[in-house]
From Swiss-Prot:
Species, as recorded: Methylorubrum populi (strain ATCC BAA-705 / NCIMB 13946 / BJ001) (Methylobacterium populi)
Gene: smpB
Region listing for Disordered, in residue ranges: 131-157
Location (main, coarse): cytoplasm
Keyword set, alphabetical order: Cytoplasm, RNA-binding
Keyword Transcription regulation tagged: no
Name used for this protein in its record: SsrA-binding protein
Top-level taxonomy: Bacteria, Pseudomonadati, Pseudomonadota, Alphaproteobacteria, Hyphomicrobiales
Entry-linked PANTHER family: SSRA-BINDING PROTEIN, TMRNA-BINDING COMPONENT OF TRANS-TRANSLATION TAGGING COMPLEX
Amino acid sequence: MAPKTEPGRRVVADNRSARFHYAIEDTFEAGIALTGTEVKSLRGGKATIGESYAGPSGNDLMLFNAYIPEYLEANRFNHDTKRPRRLLLHRRQINKLIGATQRQGYTVIPLKIYFNDKGRAKVELGLGKGKQLHDKRESVKQRDWQRDKARLMRDKG
């Protein structure tokens, strides 16, 4: 069955492995400063955020290593595919995220890139710590148990 989405929210890129590799404690919604060809390429549904992360650059928070492919109909005015992109957050949120990454060993990971109901590109950021190997095994056990439990309930009912 297809996953249910919120009305007016069209997901372009999803970082599904982030919740497996990191224990996400808090999420934030941020805007992205994009060029015109980047927006057109995102509307085509092509982006990769599997290896990307967010980090401080001066007083701002930037999205690093996010791949947005070149727009095919653009000519010489195309964008760099892996350039750092500025994240648009309130100053209080930026200070909280930068402080957590510098002092407490947290990482800021992009979880999704989507268009909201107004047509603006947004990033869902997760603040979390990396999981150890035994934590990942526990996550796999929990997922398998939930799957087996659902299968048993379906077969009994």
